[in-house]
């Protein structure tokens, strides 16, 4: 049978989110589809906006610490570390050496816990229910350690301007060493269960590729940038705290696809363990909190400080007018930048690949919307 007219398809609009298990929060994307292929992506954010930066203006410098836990709520210790270090630089406060080591241990444990959520969630997004349980099993061990130290598993409120709130309990060190030893076995399990799985590799290799040049142009940082071949890690290149005392390898990929971003997190957890082990060898007894005023009043001025968070560069810009409350705070969150590259990476892919691409960026809406 012959037809004297051409067959064609019409473009279709699909709302992805804001309440969808694969959006990792209340995030919405509008896909324009030609069949199953995405021809355009529009980011819609703001559903979780809480006015964090404005709230800071009516809180003392110390009172704002718990609010930072609610940014990337999977990386509370890292959020707190970046904030208190910024205030310390502005106020000229020296931190006791033991507190510096405790901060490093807590920060790297938090990095491991954050990466475990990334790995488990991405596996689950690709229908990997069994791997998800393995990753979250090990994350529970980290959260138990955090709870042992500060009494909370996620919103820790542990860092203080001038150190940490209190010293490590006696049972912490043996429990930490046991966990670090157990992780050697876990890495072997990860490889066997999912990383080396042919189906998983088919879903992630060559998917969501972004070049190093484009990654830099979009402002990507952290594992997402290093997966595209850019060798940049603030812990090594602009060391803060006492990171210059530790030997570790900066993991750098080359392919810039979903699989490479996955490998970044696996390998970075191993490096975090190396850092923690070195810190355990070097830490000495001493005070954990400097003598600072109850109401901290930094001199007039402004400062910007950034750290290497679990998802990328986390920065704080603080303006002080000399009183006990910040005049202005701006938070540079890596997830806000990373999600901006999603349309570029998802355009031309299929819907199922877009799920993998979004998961590989590891966004978290508490940090995007603030």
Curated annotation (Swiss-Prot):
It is a peripheral membrane protein. It catalyses: a quinone + NADH + 5 H(+)(in) = a quinol + NAD(+) + 4 H(+)(out). The gene is nuoD. The lineage of its organism: Bacteria, Bacillati, Bacillota, Clostridia, Eubacteriales. It comes from Clostridium beijerinckii (strain ATCC 51743 / NCIMB 8052). Keywords: Cell membrane, Membrane, NAD, Quinone, Translocase, Transport. NDH-1 is composed of 14 different subunits. Subunits NuoB, C, D, E, F, and G constitute the peripheral sector of the complex. This is NADH-quinone oxidoreductase subunit D. Its EC number is 7.1.1.-. The keyword NAD applies. Belongs to the complex I 49 kDa subunit family. InterPro entries: NADH_Q_OxRdtase_suD (IPR001135), NADH_UbQ_OxRdtase_49kDa_CS (IPR014029), NDH1_su_D/H (IPR022885), NiFe-Hase_large (IPR029014). NDH-1 shuttles electrons from NADH, via FMN and iron-sulfur (Fe-S) centers, to quinones in the respiratory chain. The immediate electron acceptor for the enzyme in this species is believed to be a menaquinone. Couples the redox reaction to proton translocation (for every two electrons transferred, four hydrogen ions are translocated across the cytoplasmic membrane), and thus conserves the redox energy in a proton gradient. PROSITE patterns: COMPLEX1_49K. It holds the Pfam family Complex1_49kDa. GO terms for cellular component: plasma membrane. Its main location: membrane.
């Amino acid at each position: 049978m012959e037809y004297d007219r051409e067959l064609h398809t019409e473009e279709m609009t699909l709302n992805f989110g804001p309440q969808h298990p694969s959006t990792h929060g209340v995030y919405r994307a509008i896909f324009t589809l030609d069949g199953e292929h995405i021809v355009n992506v529009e980011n819609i954010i703001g559903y979780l906006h809480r006015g964090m930066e404005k709230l800071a203006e009516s809180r003392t410098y110390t009172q704002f610490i718990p609010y930072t836990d609610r940014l990337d709520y999977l990386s509370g210790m890292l959020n707190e570390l970046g904030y208190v270090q910024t205030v310390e630089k502005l106020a000229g406060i020296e931190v006791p050496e033991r507190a510096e080591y405790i901060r490093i241990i807590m920060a790297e444990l938090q990095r491991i816990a954050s990466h475990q959520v990334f790995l488990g969630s991405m596996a689950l997004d690709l229908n990997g229910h069994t791997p998800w349980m393995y990753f979250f099993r090990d994350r529970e061990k980290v959260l138990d350690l955090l709870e042992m130290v500060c009494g909370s598993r996620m919103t820790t409120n542990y860092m203080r301007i001038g150190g940490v709130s209190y010293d490590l309990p006696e049972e912490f060190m043996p429990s930490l060493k046991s966990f670090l030893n157990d992780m050697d076995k876990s890495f072997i399990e990860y490889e066997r269960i999912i990383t080396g799985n042919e189906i998983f590799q088919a879903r992630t290799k060559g998917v969501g590729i972004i070049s190093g040049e484009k990654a830099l142009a979009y402002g990507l940082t952290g594992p997402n940038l290093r997966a595209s071949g850019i060798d940049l890690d603030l812990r090594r290149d602009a060391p803060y705290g006492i990171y210059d005392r530790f030997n570790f390898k900066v993991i750098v990929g080359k392919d810039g696809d979903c699989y490479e971003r996955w490998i970044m997190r696996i390998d970075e957890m191993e490096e975090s363990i190396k850092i923690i082990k070195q810190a355990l060898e070097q830490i000495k007894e001493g005070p954990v909190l400097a003598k600072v005023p109850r109401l901290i009043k930094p001199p007039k001025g402004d400062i910007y400080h950034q750290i290497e968070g679990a998802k990328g560069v986390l920065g704080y810009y603080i303006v002080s007018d000399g009183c006990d409350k910040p005049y202005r705070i701006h938070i540079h969150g890596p997830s806000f930048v990373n999600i901006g590259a999603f349309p570029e990476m998802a355009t031309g892919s299929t819907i199922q690949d877009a799920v993998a691409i979004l998961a590989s960026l590891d966004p978290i809406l508490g940090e995007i919307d603030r």
